[in-house]
Curated annotation (Swiss-Prot):
One of its GO terms (molecular function) is structural molecule activity. InterPro entries: Cucumovirus_coat, Cucumovirus_coat_Asu_sf. The modification N-acetylmethionine is found at residue 1. The N-terminal arginine-rich stretch does not seem to be the major RNA-binding region that allows formation of an infectious ribonucleoprotein complex. Gene3D superfamilies: Cucumovirus coat protein, subunit A. Pfam families: Cucumo_coat. Keywords: Acetylation, Capsid protein, Ribonucleoprotein, RNA-binding, T=3 icosahedral capsid protein, Viral nucleoprotein, Virion. This is Capsid protein. Residues 1-28 are annotated as: Disordered.
Length: 218
């Protein structure tokens, strides 16, 4: 046998199997694969349909978009009688409204129940006409027209309902800081009278970064 034949025979020789054998896939492995596939489908679904002003979603804490920061407004609703309403326009600080052409990407509402909270409230953000006086009748009509997605927040024995946030994406609308006065937070006290010491609302407006002062206030 010449050298070439010897080499060919070596190549054709079957590789010796490794010692031992791999165990059959366990049920845990199969469950993990199914879970991974479900998470993959969920991620694709979320990526395809990001929340908009008409389709908000509950979210956990999120980082601001690159190049953006946020300004928070704290609202303490006054006493609201049972089946009555409250509305407050989004009024940002002067130091922010000075840059009224900076774009706004998202608005988030966070509901913070105080220890005495034992009610059910509906909360939303609506773009309202400048002529609207946010009267009870006007707010009632906006809740009733079905055009406003609503966060229903109810008393929870643990103190905080699992879903206490509502996010609106305004990116597609090219809204800016100057437009924020056209938006208002609306509250409906459904089952009980809401007292002044029961609830605090935090509104986070995510907008393009603005210059910050390097001088301490006098």
């Amino acid at each position: 046998m010449d050298k070439s034949e010897s080499t060919g025979a070596g190549r054709n020789r079957r590789r010796r199997p490794r010692r031992g054998s791999r165990s059959a896939p366990s049920s845990a492995d199969a469950n993990f694969r199914v879970l991974s596939q479900q998470l993959s489908r969920l991620n694709k679904t979320l990526a395809a349909g990001r929340p908009t002003i008409n389709h908000p979603t509950f979210v956990g804490s999120e980082r601001c978009k690159p190049g953006y920061t946020f300004t928070s407004i704290t609202l303490k609703p006054p006493k609201i009688d049972r089946e009555s309403y409250y509305g407050k326009r989004l009024l940002l600080p002067d130091s922010v409204t000075e840059y009224d052409k900076k774009l706004v990407s998202r608005i988030q509402i966070r509901v913070n129940p105080l220890p005495k909270f034992d009610s059910t409230v509906w909360v939303t953000v609506r773009k309202v006409p400048a002529s609207s006086d946010l009267s009870v009748a006007a707010i009632s009509a906006m809740f009733a027209d079905g055009a406003s997605p609503v966060l229903v927040y109810q008393y929870a024995a643990s103190g905080v309902q699992a879903n206490n946030k509502l996010l609106y994406d305004l990116s597609a609308m090219r809204a800016d800081i100057g437009d924020m006065r056209k938006y208002a937070v609306l509250v409906y006290s459904k089952d009980d009278t809401l007292e002044t010491d029961e609830l605090v609302l935090h509104v986070d407006v995510e907008h393009q970064r603005i210059p910050t002062s390097g001088v301490l206030p006098v």
